[in-house]
């Protein structure tokens, strides 16, 4: 009894708590329905799950249960020592438990490159995802990644620690050793950063690509600001998932990212909502892909959204996949990304279309249409940033970018009638020139 009282006292002292009446936790219903109605599980797994559910019930007193403990114990159901429930069954178990709680998120996603035998602890899951994130970044953009490690602008850099500096100077035997040190250092730092930014939302690791987002937030903003941004994102995401019966799809991600943008930069957020005639669709995995193509220069006064939308005009299709959706629907195919379709990178997204043998879609046209759709958005945001940025380097970069956009795109954005008019004027001028000077 004293043990239980001590346990519950710790719960009261824990700031990371969730009230049961808000999210409607009903452990007994979960246990009864789970065991009696939905799944046939062998005796060993049954005993393990029963013990886990019993442990969860110990934490429940006075309508309070720590959210991190709840999800931590649920994870044990699907990552049992000595055995592993298949990914499919794990999703079924999670889906059932969440459904019993009155939540219906359809996004039960596991780390993409961790197979069943590898998953035996939370740290293993994080380390594998972090390793994948770091290695992917190096493979995709090795030059920029090397520059980041020496970027003195980044506060709290992973190389600000004296021990890391000493270690990095010692390992100089060959380029391979140096690269391995960079990878290992970033993996370890990213693991620490991820856990810190997750805070109470440890289970958020199961959201596809979280570590990859963390990596670039850490690189761009440094530890202190990066943790603040990622904590904000985790909180907003959690509020949506646990308080509303959302279908976790493009609309869901759009709402979450818009909320984040609204908090960070209300002007940009209002421009997005005002200018785009149809809802732009954001996919976090596309954002990740874009950041792996990151440019050399990242200035302090440029927000992440500024950096995202202004670095390269050629990547503008990331902002509004609704044109792709529209094209896809024109041929009578319903477009819907489910939890089982892990579109980690844009190439896989297009590959998915190709696998379906959808040859009627003109991808170049889609990208160009998206560029045109967002052209005004760029101009307004860039103009706004130019008038509000004090750093001359940042201002000069945006002004140069603004000019380059029009230099490259102005004729393409003209209507057919306008182009014909310009062509006719050019012909008339040539005719006049011929009459006057040739004869």
Stretches found by the model and what they are:
Residues 203-213:
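Conserved phosphate/anionic-ligand binding catalytic regions in large, soluble enzymes, centered on
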Residues 174-183, 194-201, 265-277, 281-290, ...:
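Active-site-adjacent structural elements in folded domains
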Residues 75, 79, 94, 98, ...:
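Amphipathic alpha-helical interaction motifs in eukaryotic regulatory proteins
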Residues 282-338, 423-427:
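Long, repeat-rich segments with strong aromatic
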Residues 1-194, 395-439:
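N-terminal transition regions in large eukaryotic proteins
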Residues 88-92, 181, 185-189, 208-209, ...:
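Residues within HEAT/ARM-like alpha-solenoid scaffolds
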Residues 227-281, 313-407:
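Extended, Lys/Glu/Leu-rich amphipathic alpha-helical scaffolds
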Residues 105-152, 231-286:
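Aromatic-anchored, charged helix-turn/loop surface patch used as a conserved interaction hotspot
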